[in-house]
Structure formats: C-alpha cells, structure tokens
Amino acid sequence: MAQLMEGEISLNQPDSGNLARTRFYVCPACGNILFSTGGASVFCCGRKLEPLSPLPRENGPAIMIEQIDGEYFITADHPMEKGHFLSFAAYVKNEQIFFTRLYPEQNPSFRFPLFPGGTLFLYCTQHGLTRYPNIR
C-alpha cells in the first residue's frame, strides 16, 4: 500500500489467457467470491486476499455426475446448513468458466454444459476449495 501511495505501481506479467491457471478468492468478512486468470492483487473489505489452495478430490465431498440433455447434472454429498455449505461450483474447460452460486438449505446439485475433460471446483465454507480434474 505504501508503494501505491508513493506513486509506485508494480505491474503483473501479461495474462496469457490460460484459464487452467484460474485462481479463486473468497473474502472472509463478506463472503464475496472473486477469481482471476493470472497473477493479481485482490482486495475486499480492506483486506488483501490470498488465492485459495485447492485440495485433491479425495479430500472433498463425494460427487455424482449424470449426463442429461447435453449437460452434466452434478450432485455433491455435502451438508447445506447455514454455517457449513457449498458456496460455489465452477467448471473450467479450455477458454470458458461456468460458475454457479450455491446457498444454505438449497440442494447441493447443479448443471454445467457437457464439455468432457474439464476441471470442477467446489468451495465449502468450512473446508475450502476442492479440485476435481478431468470430469467425464
């Protein structure tokens, strides 16, 4: 912050546009969800946010994937209580990101377009981000 106040700006490297390097951020104060496709200084509620470090799928909730009408219908085995729920699901494939916000007391199921081979991310408010690569 001092550098910014003194007129010094540190520039990031140009974004290569590779969505496989997408980083997710969640504000601990307000729950705001942000993402970047490259290196970024992300702030919310006056705090600098660090990118979430995804856990491997073995550490996350079990998921069931069905192919229905040209889409993935995904259900997660996870509680959806006010203090412990899945906050979002994101599916990243090539140059596209599909994002669904989830809420407490809602069913933990969602749909994404059928693009095999992408990566699914689920964010739990208590346990963090889980990465599920190579969805088929």
How does the language model describe each region?
Residues 15-21, 33-37, 115:
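Short, flexible, mixed-charge glycine/proline-rich loop motifs
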Residues 38-49:
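Cysteine-rich micro-motifs
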Residues 33-34, 48-49, 128:
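Cys/His-rich microdomains that often coordinate metals
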Residues 126-136:
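Edge beta-strands of extracellular beta-sandwich domains
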Residues 27-30, 44, 124:
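Short cysteine-rich clusters marking metal-coordination/redox-active sites
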Residues 49-63:
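Short metal-binding segments enriched for Cys and/or His
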